[in-house]
Amino acid sequence: MIQIFLRVKKAQPSSDASNKYGFLTVLNDYEILLESPEDSHAYRVSKSKTLEKASFTKVFPPSCTQLDVFSTICAPLIADSLVNMNDTLLFTLGVSGAGKTYTLFGPSDRPGVAFLALDALFYAIKGREASPQTVEFLRSQLEKCKIVEASKFLRGEAPLDIKVPNTEYYASHFPKIEEKNYQYAIYLSFAEIYNDRIFDLLEKASFFGHRHALSLKKSSTSDKKSIAGIQKVFVSNTTEAYKLIQKVLQLRKSTSTKSNSVSSRSHLIMSIELFKVCTKSNKFESCQIDLVDLAGSERTRSAETSGLLLREGASINRSLLTLGQCLEALRRKHEGKQHIIPFRQSKLTELLFHSGHLSGLAGINMLVNIDPFGSFDENAQVMRYSANAREILPPPLNENSGSQSPSHSLLQKSKNTSSTKALTSHLEQLQQENQQLRMLLADADSEMMNLEYEIRQQMTREMEERVSEVERTFLTKLLEESAQGIEYTDQKLEKMGGWMKKLQDENSEKTETIAQLEQIIEELHEELRSLEEESIKESSATQQNENQHKRSSRKLLYEDKQAIQEAHTINTKRKLWPQSTLIQAPNSDDEENVPSPSPKKKVVSPIKPLSPSRRPPLTSLYSGTTDIDINEL
């Protein structure tokens, strides 16, 4: 059973009415009216304003808070899972920038549904949290899953200050678990559907930022399909859960487009798995709460995307179109008509249907987000998607509606008639006409869906051709730039070749100059060697001359000494013997004939006089001699 809710993005009301926001008018708590503006495609086609009325289980105006949304659409799902252990699903639908991610997650001061749901779960199981032994028991039982601790991913993560409601609020909305023989464990997993491939957001990406794509596999105990190999993280408190969600939001693929500054490029599926374990028998049961943040549909013209972003947008639109077709087929099946549900055309619908959500095995709430000041055509298309599930909606929450069906009006008017049989006949006729009109409307809807599908296929082909043309233009431009780069490189190489030749010529000249200088140096070395040899020879000759001069000096000294001794002897004789005696007795036989000393000849030495520095000192020449009085000589 699907319930559809509508949330209007925060905006200021128009000046003419307090309940009118752009092209949207909130009629009451469950109905809105869309009025096409003049710049819309619908206005240009019809050449006048078009009015579209849509009904929902509940309409949230822009003034509603995050807690209001949680209390209405998510709190009943959480309570059902806690009490009855039923699987539940909440997914958002809307154009890019309509506020889907804000509703599910939100900032820390206005936390979204995901944070409030976890806070409510931990409040309900407070005092009944799983012990370490229970956690190990579950790990052993869930062998096919990758069970990891939250601390593996939260090293170095800063704590988050999430503003959550007080305990009085939870006490009034959720039952407190009082069963003493049961313990509860909460596991979180995060899957991303990007370009129709499933990835685990908690898997560590490679060096190039790639992750391993996962597949869907059937469970051994049921026909449900689950994501094989995805990591399930055990969280023991809200702090770990909040940090884990914050880390995942940073890893999710997003970019900036013209229509949305932070546009999600993938569908995010956050799974909260609640395990209930009996401590006595070790039996356990589980339920799964899935929160799905669908990427927003966008038009290429308004988003101005190209290349990779264009392919991402086309993949998102294809998966959303398949989801709309599945909802339409589910509506027809609910009416008793045999219709094939094309859920295998997209990984998103295959996961939602095979997990038991859209097949009627779980409670489903769908939240449609609308931007009243955005594109009318895109938001109207989202309204048509949500209309596919109207036939399986429960009655609106507000039963005091001002509008009544024609059959009801007829019954009111026929109270005063007395013919009950005629009234019954007329009522059967109206029911037949109503059935025929329903069949005609269903056929018209089918034709419109087929026409829309053909138009979208044609637009897709045209867009692919446009993308191919853009790629060809880009490749042509790239080749031209490459050719210019090659030409520029050739010119540079040619200039470098000229410079190299010039440098080689200069190098040759310098090499010759170096050879000449080396030859001159060699000649100088030869001259230096010859000069050294001459110097050695001159030094040897000088040494010989010095030696000869020393010998001559010693000889002269010896002769001078002999002369001095002879002079001293003569002087002594003169003192002892007078000169007359010496003169008178020349012929005496008794006396010795002493000849007079002949004058000493001056010996001229052929040796050059020594320089003062080389002349021996007089003390060395006259050492050992007797002092002689020159006057006496």
Curated annotation (Swiss-Prot):
It comes from the Eukaryota. ATP binds at G94, V95, S96, G97, A98, G99, K100, T101. It holds the Pfam family Kinesin. InterPro entries: Kinesin-like_fam, Kinesin_motor_dom, Kinesin_motor_dom_sf, P-loop_NTPase. SUPFAM superfamilies: P-loop containing nucleoside triphosphate hydrolases. Belongs to the TRAFAC class myosin-kinesin ATPase superfamily. Kinesin family. Kinesin-like motor protein involved in anaphase B spindle elongation. This is Kinesin-like motor protein 9.
